[in-house]
Amino acid sequence: QPYKVLEVSNPQLREKLRAVSANQSQVTDASHLFVFCNKTSVTDEEIDQEMRLRASINEGEAEKLVRYGEFLKNSMKKMSALEMYHWTAKQTYLALATAVAACAELKIDCSPMEGFSIEKYNEILNSSAQGLSAATLLAVGYRHTDDQAQHLKKVRKPVENLFEVVS
């Protein structure tokens, strides 16, 4: 889990973030704003900590986890800094998808978002100092009863244009 999720609750910070988010209203209007940040690098110690955590939860798996940890360390040593950045950023989207599914299950509205300045978010949230970089956003809450968009039908590509069977 090479990422961290920041919940931004400070209204002044959210105003600053909105200004560098193409003025998307959800940044300030949603009751909760989550910024999914990827780690810019992963250390051997962090991998060891993760393996210890997994071993403490899944007793009897320690030997397999040591091998898996070594595999991860060796794989990551082969990555350039840019490859590491891209890989960890992709991991945030897996967490984002889980959060969106959880919101749907709980019947809570949410809006996964991009369209913001990563550099400015990192500056405003001081995330770079923690070895993090903003990757994606999730605005969460209940829509306003006057929200005109709630009555619009969702537009999606036809299934036959979206999926292709490869045989």
What kind of feature is each model-predicted range?
Residues Q1-S167:
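Acidic, surface-exposed loops and disordered segments
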